Amino acid sequence: MNKQKGMTLLEVLVALAIFSLAGLTLLQTTAQQARNAGMMKEKMLASWLADNQQVRLHLNKLWPEKSATGALVTYAGEEWYLSWQGVDTEFSQLRALDIEVRRHKQDTAAIFSLRSYVVHE
């Protein structure tokens, strides 16, 4: 009797199915990581913008107005919308400063929010 050498068609198809599933899983994972990297970059840039605005307002020694103020800025080659507003605290000499960063003025959710406090001199 001759002994067969090699693999049967069924064995080849099973191996092919296993490798294709592994490839699809790897592709999905890579796509998810690419999406997350983009979101992380956007959040990082937004946090830098909020920090810069906070420092700018503190250096100018401005008492934050209670009305919302906003500005369209270009940063890292992209346009962003910054808004900031003073919020009263229980102490009259202390006011909270809320800064929010959005991609567009009409966006409902901020990409990044920052709260700091300003003492009235």
Swiss-Prot record:
- Membrane-spanning segments: 7-27
Q: What happens when the gene is disrupted?
A: Deletion mutant shows longer pili but their number is reduced.
Q: How does it sit in the membrane?
A: Single-pass membrane protein
Q: How is it modified after translation?
A: Cleaved by prepilin peptidase. Methylated by prepilin peptidase at the amino group of the N-terminal methionine once the leader sequence is cleaved by prepilin peptidase.
Q: Which residues form a coiled coil?
A: none
Name a single GO cellular component: type II protein secretion system complex
**Stored InterPro entries:** N_methyl_site, Pilin-like, T2SS_GspI_C, T2SS_protein-GspI
Q: Which Pfam families match?
A: N_methyl (PF07963), T2SSI (PF02501)
Q: Which family does it belong to?
A: Belongs to the GSP I family.
Q: What is this protein for, i.e. what is its function?
A: Component of the type II secretion system required for the energy-dependent secretion of extracellular factors such as proteases and toxins from the periplasm. Part of the pseudopilus tip complex that is critical for the recognition and binding of secretion substrates.
How is the subunit organization of this protein annotated in UniProt?
Answer: Type II secretion is composed of four main components: the outer membrane complex, the inner membrane complex, the cytoplasmic secretion ATPase and the periplasm-spanning pseudopilus. Interacts with core component PulG. Interacts with pseudopilins PulJ and PulK.
Q: Which NCBIfam families match?
A: gspI, IV_pilin_GFxxxE
Write the protein's name. Type II secretion system protein I
Source organism per entry reads Klebsiella michiganensis (strain ATCC 8724 / DSM 4798 / JCM 20051 / NBRC 3318 / NRRL B-199 / KCTC 1686 / BUCSAV 143 / CCM 1901)
- Source organism lineage? Bacteria, Pseudomonadati, Pseudomonadota, Gammaproteobacteria, Enterobacterales
Please state the gene responsible for encoding this protein. pulI
